[in-house]
Amino acid sequence: MERIRDLSSKKAAVIFTKSSCCMCHSIKTLFYELGASPAIHELDKDPEGREMERALRALGSSNPAVPAVFVGGRYIGSAKDIISFHVDGSLKQMLKDAKAIWL
Amino acid sequence: MADTSPRTDVSTDDDTDHPDLGSEGALVNTAASDSSDRSKGKMDQKTLRRLAQNREAARKSRLRKKAYVQQLENSRLKLTQLEQELQRARQQGVFISGTGDQAHSTGGNGALAFDAEHSRWLEEKNKQMNELRSALNAHAGDSELRIIVDGVMAHYEELFRIKSNAAKNDVFHLLSGMWKTPAERCFLWLGGFRSSELLKLLANQLEPMTERQLMGINNLQQTSQQAEDALSQGMESLQQSLADTLSSGTLGSSSSGNVASYMGQMAMAMGKLGTLEGFIRQADNLRLQTLQQMIRVLTTRQSARALLAIHDYFSRLRALSSLWLARPRE
């Protein structure tokens, strides 16, 4: 949990993924399309990946552990939340507020 | 002995050309000529027994033939019945997918159940839309329209719930679009429509729109397209990684002692296939969110017109499909 808090606050947008997760690939693509360049942390490449996955699962309650998206150091949600926030325009606003994008 | 069997009399009279026995098959004739070779007019126990056996065999053969004909007749009736059912279903606009597919898919019954559920959903939708159409034509007030619009949106949510359940059961059936008409299938994206395409169609039909609304719909069209592209990219990476998993280790590996690695490979591929369901769910989530956002941008009356326009578009696509299938072919 400590490590997640650490990593998630180091950049305006942070996404925890797994290298084998295809939905993570979709969410990353969406962020790039929006012009944000999020920090990507692959849990399966991290020595503390297992503990981090457990912590993320607890954080997202019913959500899958990955993708887990943080904007401005705050947990935003997983794929479903990101798509919803993207469609209603609030994701863009969050990214602007966190200075992950400028326009 | 001779008087117990009615046939004995006959065979003593004329054993070479026997009309009764002849009708019972070649075996009987052989037996009859056999007996004539040995001793004319007299039949020993052995011959009698053989004749009796022949008669029994012939009787069984007739029964079998009768049963077979009966079975054919039953099959014919069943086929006629099925054809009538299919015809009825076609008239109702239900698509019955090929039985071959269903026999192979594990969720065969699930697929059938979903098809039935979906056609019920469509029927209910038609009713709602007729109601909405007459309300619009009668210049009903916003509050009345609002109730119907909310009902339609709730009905869409129901569709996505039904699809989500069906995807757990048979994800390939949903992706194949076999529950839709062929023309609809042609436009299929991740088991449904592309919201961004629908919004493009709507733009002309919602005039007049305020500057703000125009921007809202344009933005929505763009965001839904971005999300569609992102999901498509994810699907591509899924296909790629599935192909990589299945093709790894097929070259140069010896045939023996690789059962474990083969099974491991398959298990990994199965895990990847499992994520298909997530893509359908997110695509439907995108569709629902887009419709909801569209309604937030538009007025109640515009929303009603938009939902009706979407409905009419799909109705026409289905009608086009039927016309195409029924077209005369040389």
UniProtKB/Swiss-Prot annotation, chain A:
Protein keywords: Cytoplasm, Disulfide bond, Electron transport, Redox-active center, Transport
Domain of life, source organism: Eukaryota
Organism per entry: Arabidopsis thaliana
Domain Glutaredoxin residue range list: 1-102
NCBIfam families hit by this protein: GlrX-like_plant
Compartment(s): Cytoplasm
Family label: Belongs to the glutaredoxin family. CC-type subfamily.
GO BP: negative regulation of transcription by RNA polymerase II; response to nitrate
Gene Ontology CC: one annotated term: cytoplasm
Keyword Transport listed: yes
SUPFAM superfamilies reported in the protein's UniProt record: Thioredoxin-like
UniProt name for this protein: Glutaredoxin-C11
Biological role stated in the UniProt entry: Has a glutathione-disulfide oxidoreductase activity in the presence of NADPH and glutathione reductase. Reduces low molecular weight disulfides and proteins.
ATP-binding in keyword set: no
Annotated gene: GRXC11
Disulfide bonds: 21-24
Swiss-Prot record, chain B:
GO cellular component: cytoplasm; nucleus; RNA polymerase II transcription regulator complex; RNA polymerase II transcription repressor complex
Compartment(s) of residence: Nucleus
SUPFAM superfamilies: Leucine zipper domain (SSF57959)
Tissue: Expressed in the whole plant.
Ranges in coiled-coil conformation: 45-142, 217-244
Location of the bZIP domain: 44-107
Keywords: Activator, Coiled coil, DNA-binding, Hypersensitive response, Nucleus, Plant defense, Transcription, Transcription regulation
Family: Belongs to the bZIP family.
Protein name, UniProt field: Transcription factor TGA2
